[in-house]
Amino acid sequence: MFLKTFSRLALTFNLVLLTTLVSCTHVHAEKPTYYIYLAGPEVFLPNAVESGKSKQARIQALNQQNDWPFTLVGLYPLDNSIEDFGHNFDTGIRIYEANIELMDKAHTVAANMVRFRGPSMDVGTAFEMGYMNAANKPVFAYYEAKPFYGKDETPGLFADRVREHYPVSKDDPYIDADGQSIENFEMSDNLMMIGAMQTGNGDVALTFDDVILQIADYYLSK
C-alpha cells in the first residue's frame, strides 16, 4: 500500500515538474517585441491612415522574411482614437498627449526626414526625434519623398537643398536672401537632428525598408 501511494506521489511530482519545465521553456522561447514609433509628415497626406497601415504591413513582412529573434511592431500616430475630434485647441493638445503616450511605449523611432513645406524636415517630426533622444532611446531616420512629391529624391546636403527651395544671396551661396547664414556642416538637415541620430545608426536611410533593417541590426547587436 505504501509503495503504491509513494509511486503515485512520485508520478504526480514528475508530471508537475515536467509541466513546469515545458511552461518555462515556452516563456523563454517567446520573442521579445520592440515597438517603433513611425514619425513623419505622412499624417498630413490625403491617404494618411493607409500610409501608416502600409508601413506597419511592411514591418510585419520583414519580420516574416528575416525570422529575427524578436518582433518589430510599428506604432503610428493615427493609431490613436481621439474622441470628440474638432479643429480646436483642445483637440490639438489631446493629439499631442496621445502621441507622447505612443512614444513612451515605443523602444525606438523611425522618422521620415523628407523636406516638408520648405527645405527642412517637418517640425513635429523633429520634436519627436528630440523627445526620443532625450528619453535615451535610439533614433533612426530615412528620407522618402515620393508620396509627397511624386518622385524619388535623395536627402543630399542641407545647404544645397536650401538653395534649391529657398531664395539665397547672389553674392554668397551660404547666405539666404534675408542675410542669414545657411548651416553648412556636410549634413542632410539641421545638425541637432543629425546629432540625435548618433544614438542609432547615424545615417539617413534611403528607404523605409532600409531604416527598419537598420533597427533590426541594432537589436541583433545587443
Go through each PLM region and give its residues.
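Conserved catalytic or regulatory cores that recognize and/or transform ribose-phosphate-containing ligands
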Residues: 24-222
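Bacterial N-terminal signal peptides
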Residues: 10-22
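Bacterial N-terminal signal peptides that target proteins for export
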Residues: 1-13
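Alpha-helical protein-protein interaction elements
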Residues: 5, 16-18, 29, 36
